[in-house]
Amino acid sequence: MIEYAVLDGRDAEQGILDDFVRLVQEGGAINEHYVRDGIRRKGTKMVLARIEEIIVGVAALKVPLKVYRNGIESEAKSGHEISQELYPFELGYVAVSEHHRGDGIGKALVNKVVELSDGHGLFATTSHPAMKESLLPGAGFKPVGTSWANDQNELLQLFIFSA
């Protein structure tokens, strides 16, 4: 049975943080340093999916820095405004272990983060096909702006969820 837990990122034990980072790194899109810093930022909530105490999926409700938000809004990236007032949070670090993909864990994690936003808007960026094509649209996120290439030459898309 899959159990879901929510933790404040600043209160997470080192072992849990390491497992969280490991799963995100398996997806390959985000530098470990950024994940560790992002999880420890004030207001960030970690969502964990566990089977028999083993973490098999993760996601986070993030509180993005203004410089990060401004970068995404720039014409070189999405070219779409994501104001702090309308979209105070970001859905991020969604990852599911390889052996449990296709079990609905990713969908449940995305929905849990939407619930944690408590009626506030969210944004997300992704290059992952399943996130772009089904998980985010299925949770009510809409693609906006233009796509752009990241440092690995993957095509990123900005999505917004309006409360």
Model-derived features with residue positions:
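Short amphipathic alpha-helix that is part of the acyltransferase structural core
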Residues: 1-37, 41, 46-56
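Short hydrophobic/aromatic beta-strand or adjacent loop that forms the aromatic wall/cage
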Residues: 44, 153-159
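Conserved acyl-donor/pantetheine-binding loop and adjacent beta-alpha core of acyl/acetyltransferases
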Residues: 48-50, 54-93, 101, 150-154
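Short, flexible beta-strand-to-coil junctions
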Residues: 50-53, 126-129, 162-163
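Short beta-strand-to-coil "C-cap" segments at the C-terminal boundary of structured domains/repeats
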Residues: 62, 160-163
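Conserved acetyl-CoA-binding loop-helix of GNAT-fold acetyltransferases
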Residues: 93-96, 102-115, 138
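Conserved GNAT acetyl-CoA-binding A-motif
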Residues: 115-129
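Conserved active-site alpha-helix within GNAT-family acetyltransferase domains
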Residues: 128-152
